[in-house]
Every structure is written in C-alpha cells, then in structure tokens.
UniProtKB/Swiss-Prot annotation:
Subcellular location: Cytoplasm
Basic and acidic residues compositional bias, start-end: 1-16, 24-35
InterPro entries per the UniProt record, alphabetical: GrpE, GrpE_coiled_coil, GrpE_head
Name the UniProt record assigns to this protein: Protein GrpE
SUPFAM superfamilies named among the record's database cross-references: Coiled-coil domain of nucleotide exchange factor GrpE, Head domain of nucleotide exchange factor GrpE
Chaperone among keywords: yes
GO annotation, cellular component aspect: cytoplasm
Length: 235
C-alpha cells in the first residue's frame, strides 16, 4: 500500500515539474515574440528618423545652394555697378582733362598774342598785326563752332560758356584794334573779294550765285581782308 502511494506521489511530482517546464517554455516564447515585436518597432522608428534626417539634409543643401546662387548674382550686380561707375568717372575725367588742355593752350595763345601784339604795336605800321590776327581769328572761329554745337552734358556746356566768354573778349580786342567782321547775310550775292565758296548746292526758289549758308565769318583789318567769309552758294 505504501509503495502505491509513493509511486502515485512520484508521478504527480513529475507531472507537476513537467507542467512548470511547459509554462516556462511558453513564457520564454512569449517573451521572445514580444522582444521581436519591440525590435521591429524600433527598426521602423529608426528608418523614419533616418529618412527625416536625409530630408532635412537635402533641404539644408538646397538652401545653401540658393544662398550661394543669390550671393553670386549679387556679386555680379555689384561688379557691373562698379564698372558703370568707373566708365562714368573715366568719361568725366577725360572731359575735364580735354577742357583743361584746351584752357591751357588758350592761355598760352593769349599770352603769346598779347606779347606779340605789344611788341608789334610799338614798331609796326597800320597792318602789322595781319599775320597774328589771322592766327587768332582761326582760334576764335573754332571757339564759335564749338559754342554753336549742341551738347546735353551740363559740365561740357559750362566749359562752352567759358569758350564763349573768351570769344567775346577777343572780338572786343579785335574792334579796339581795327579788326572787324565782314558783313555777309543770307541771299547776298556771292562776292569773291570778301567770300570763299565752300561748295555749291541746288536751292529751290533761290536764284543762282546766292549765299544760302554761312560756314565761317570773315574778318578784315581796316580795309584789307584778313580772312574771307566761308559760305555755301546756290547753283
């Protein structure tokens, strides 16, 4: 009887141990599955984070590229503005330089003429100024051509006003010393004694051999023609 009970107890104990083993195995399997699910979830989150990082990196790269492109365009604009300013400054400097050179030459001519005039005035007779006057008349004629030209630059216009002042000063000087303009008007008959024909042109409703345009004024010293008036004559 005791043997049977002992045997029965042993069997129950073995079954109980087996049941515990089975339960432990089930728990381990469930734990493994939970861990696997957790790893899968972590993998998905990590993939999203990496994709987000890559997207942010691409956006930053695009922003940097746009900034560089904008900086390059701004640099080109600034370079062009500097070139334009430099050209304007060079043009202005060139105009001032030419005007200064003309002023210097004019001052030299005035001094030369005054010195020569004062010397000749003492020793020459009535027409002693002829050669000097012709040279000066040519200068005055060039001044008048420059003054009568149309300009839009204010600085050049101011220099031309200065040229006009010098031309007027010389004309007064001429009058004081017997040098006068030869009177020539449009539609006057061409007079070879006081005029020279620059060219002839057809002029409708105008008789032949008439003055239709005055190119340069003529001058005489007392009764001698120094420089004939240059005109265009009708055919």
């Amino acid at each position: 009887m005791e043997n049977k009970n002992q045997k029965h107890n042993n069997e129950f104990h073995e079954k109980n141990q087996q049941s515990q083993k089975d339960n432990n195995n089930v728990k381990k399997e469930n734990l493994h599955e939970d861990q696997s699910d957790l790893n899968d979830a972590n993998f998905d989150d990590g993939g999203k984070k990496n994709k987000l990082k890559n997207d942010i990196k691409k956006l930053n790269h695009l922003v940097d590229s746009l900034k560089n492109e904008n900086n390059n365009k701004q640099a080109k604009i600034e370079s062009l503005e500097r070139q334009i300013n430099l050209l304007n400054e060079n043009f202005k400097s060139e105009v001032i330089k030419k005007a200064s050179e003309a002023q210097t030459k004019l001052d030299e001519k005035i001094k030369e003429f005054q010195a020569k005039y004062e010397t000749e005035l003492k020793h020459a007779k009535k027409y002693a100024l002829k050669s000097s006057a012709i040279e000066l008349i040519d200068i005055v004629s060039n001044f008048e051509l420059a003054v009568n030209s149309k300009v839009t630059n204010p600085e050049i216009a101011n220099y031309l006003k200065g040229f006009q002042m010098f031309a007027n000063m010389f004309k007064n000087y001429f009058q004081q010393n017997g040098i006068t303009e030869i009177p020539v008007n449009l539609n006057d008959d061409f007079n070879a004694e006081v005029m020279q024909a620059f060219e002839t042109q057809k002029a409708p409703n105008t008789q032949p051999n008439k003055v239709i345009k005055i190119i340069k004024k003529g001058y005489k010293l007392h009764d001698i023609v120094l420089v004939p008036a240059t005109v265009i004559v009708s055919e």
